């Protein structure tokens, strides 16, 4: 497992590690201190993932704004 301050290589790597942490926490077999450390790492990974998603969204909006003919509409998950 990467050290606390180490940045994950990619969004996908962070997501995979976060999923593993959730699985370990849900098992209920971890001692309290280890569970707290895992939870702390999970929060850190979730925040990093959120930042990466926001950056990706900004890049997409910039690319779309360069093509003025393409309408820019906010994403809504219910629209699918």
Curated annotation (Swiss-Prot):
Subcellular compartments: Cytoplasm
Enumerate the Gene3D superfamilies for this protein.
Answer: Exonuclease VII, small subunit
**GO CC annotations?**
cytosol; exodeoxyribonuclease VII complex
Catalytic activity field: Exonucleolytic cleavage in either 5'- to 3'- or 3'- to 5'-direction to yield nucleoside 5'-phosphates
Keywords attached to this entry:
Cytoplasm, Exonuclease, Hydrolase, Nuclease
EC number(s) of the enzyme?
3.1.11.6
**The keyword Nuclease is assigned to this record:** yes
Q: Which domain of life is it from?
A: Bacteria
- EC class of this enzyme? hydrolase
Q: One GO molecular-function annotation for this sequence?
A: exodeoxyribonuclease VII activity
Please give the biological process terms from Gene Ontology that the record holds: DNA catabolic process
Q: Describe its assembly.
A: Heterooligomer composed of large and small subunits.
PANTHER family, alphabetically? EXODEOXYRIBONUCLEASE 7 SMALL SUBUNIT
The record describes the protein's role as: Bidirectionally degrades single-stranded DNA into large acid-insoluble oligonucleotides, which are then degraded further into small acid-soluble oligonucleotides.
Q: Which family does it belong to?
A: Belongs to the XseB family.
Q: What is this protein called?
A: Exodeoxyribonuclease 7 small subunit
């Amino acid at each position: 497992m990467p050290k606390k301050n180490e940045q994950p290589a990619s969004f996908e790597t962070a997501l995979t590690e976060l999923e593993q942490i959730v699985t370990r926490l849900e098992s209920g077999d971890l001692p309290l201190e280890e569970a707290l450390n895992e939870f702390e790492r999970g929060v850190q990974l979730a925040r990093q993932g959120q930042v990466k998603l926001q950056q990706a969204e900004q890049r997409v909006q910039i690319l779309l704004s360069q093509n003025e003919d393409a309408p820019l509409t906010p994403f809504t998950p219910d629209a699918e």
